[in-house]
Amino acid sequence: MKFLERLQRPLAICALILAFGGIAAAEEPKKPELLVLAAASLTNVLGELSADWEKSTGVPAKLSFAASSVLARQIEAGGTADVFISADQEWMDYLQARDLIDKASRRNLVGNRLVLIAPADSQLKLKIEPGFKLADALGKGRLATGDPDTVPVGRYARSALTTLGVWDEIADRLVRADNVRSAMMFVSRGEVPLGIVYATDAAVDSKVRVVDTFPANTHAPITYPAAALSAAKPEAAAFVAFLAGEKARAAWRKFGFVEITN
């Protein structure tokens, strides 16, 4: 009998330890996780910046990339998220007009440039200027860019080509991609001879090369606004401030983005 008592006592103690340990674990607050919806052209740089943010704050940021139009519609439809980063002002304005973002948190992060690209092995030389021979350069091929009706890069492309007087010649020869990375893929795979994308996208794909850069005065400034959503976690505004702050500048420069003044 005494033997059983001696055996049961440590077992009871272990059970109590496990029970209290389970309660402590259950009561430990769960760390917040931010869901960031961002324009596809930010894929590489935000991967690095989100890691820096988590390292300094302990708050992970889960990233989801698509065309700004797709993400804005997703938010409007009630999709759960904390931060939205657009490739143009229009889609951010769209959400702000519907009170879906925290206006006070809104920041313009960086800028970009618009470029004409070709497959890396292309020998094409073409200077972008008023009336330049884009249609001739395409030959029987097509031009890939974002859908001008919805995708920011496509809107910038249409504006630039209209300003230069060549839009009407190629408007019916577009491959209308759903985001800038998809547009670039058509060129990198050699499916089309030319495409219009952002300079930062061209810089990360060795299978394409920049033919020329569009003059900045041919289109609206390419800027990336960011904001916390109205129903976001408290850390969302701090994440936006981090992206717009001094600590993030080195990463933005590394990936070729243009510094701007808010």
Model-derived regions: residue spans:
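Exported/periplasmic ABC-transporter solute-binding proteins
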Residues: A25-G79, S86-Q89, D93-N112, I117-N262
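Bacterial N-terminal signal peptides
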Residues: K2, P10-G22
